[in-house]
Each structure stands twice: as C-alpha cells, then as structure tokens.
Amino acid sequence: LLRSKGITVHVLQDSNQVMDTPDSIFPNNWFVSMEGGRLMLCPMWAPNRRHERLKFLGQLVDLIGHDKLKVSNYGPAHEAQSKFLEGTGAMILDRINMKAYACLSPRCDEDVFKKFCKEFGFKPVAFHGFQTYEGKRAAIYHTNVMMALGEAFAVVCLSAIDDLTERAALVKELQGDGKEIIDVTEDQINNFAGNEIELCNADGKRFTIMTKATYDCLTPEQRAVIEKTSEIISPDVKTIETYGGGSVRCMISEIFL
C-alpha cells in the first residue's frame, strides 16, 4: 500500500529460529535513525525486546551502509540501571524544528531523554500523561499513544496532561512552530488516535498513515485538518492492534541516510 504511493519501504524479516522476538513487528522502539547515518540503539524495558537489537542490526546496517553508519548504543548500560528510552514510541521527534516531545514514564527516563537530546541536537519538551483506567488515572507509557506530529499539524490528547503548566507549555511549543493542534479525547486515543505518522514519497508529497480504527474515530473536522496538507492512508490492522497492543505508527521506523 505504501509502495503504491511511491514511498520506499524496507521490511525487516523475522524468524523465531534464533531468538524469540514476539514484538518485532514494532521496530520503532529499538532504534532511532538520524541523518548522516547516525543510529541510536535504544534501552528497552522488556528483556525479550532487547534481542531485537542484536537480531536485526545486521539488516539495518545493510540498509544504511557500513561506510555511513555511526552507532550510539544506549542499550546495555542504561538497562543495567533500569533506565529506558524506547525509541520513537517514547519520543515524538520534530526533525524540522529540532524538538523532541516526551511523555515521561518508566519507558521514557528523563535523564536518558535529555542525554539523547543533547547528543543529537534536539530541544527537549517533557511532560506527564495519564488516562483513566478502572476509575483511576494511570500513566501513559509511550508518547505515541497520545501524540503525533505532521509538518503542519499536531495530534495530541491535551486532557491527558493533568498538569496545566505542562499542558500550556506544550501548546506554546506547537503553536510557536505554526502547527494546527488537533485535540483528541481519551476515547479517541484508545482507538490509536495518537498512533499516526506522516511520511513523504520521492516527489515530496506527504501522507499520514493511521489505522482504520483511528480514521473512523476522528471527526470529519479533525480529518480535514490533516487533509489540508497530507493524504490519509488508513489500512485495517485490527488483528495487530487487538493482539499486539500497537498500531501502524509502531510498525514503522523511519530511515534517514
């Protein structure tokens, strides 16, 4: 589907013959690719997900090229300290304005987040997010549950940020960059409304990838904001969402050369 729109797609092939990696369908958590062949390997909360770095790194190196590759391995040292930063699940990166947005949680450690931002030149914008579960406020563990960025818009569940100072600071950063804010509800993020990604094809045309469940839960007015500047692609991945716990954004990890 993405290839039909002129988007270059590489698939990391898995096999359980070597190591059991049941969550490898979500590669955006274990690495972050930056321009110039720079690659961050991420410290992962779940021990079995740490195998993905070793198992798939060779395929990734082949894509980026040995000559260009510059690796920053954040994995083992931070995992030994129980400090985690699970890639572009934990961080939403605005690569144009060089800002990194993060909902702090056990899977997004503030110290490691700030270290990443300092090394790669991002301005850190951190906050705390919550959603109501069984009548109580529970921490949101990945930022891409509640937030997504396009070049001209930002999808975010502002009501998930209970601290009004943090909420106002986030809005100020987004509006300061000229992004139109699409404020989604907790019910909508339960349908993966924050789990979207905007991609470009070789001609520079922008596409926003979201699940059918997300498309259906957004209002026509919310979709219209996205469609001003980006064509929506909305495949049905209900089985993955139901049994894997993630959606299309988690399944896509950008490659920058």
Segments predicted by a language model, with ranges:
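The feature marks the mature, well-folded catalytic cores of soluble enzymes
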Residues: L1-L257
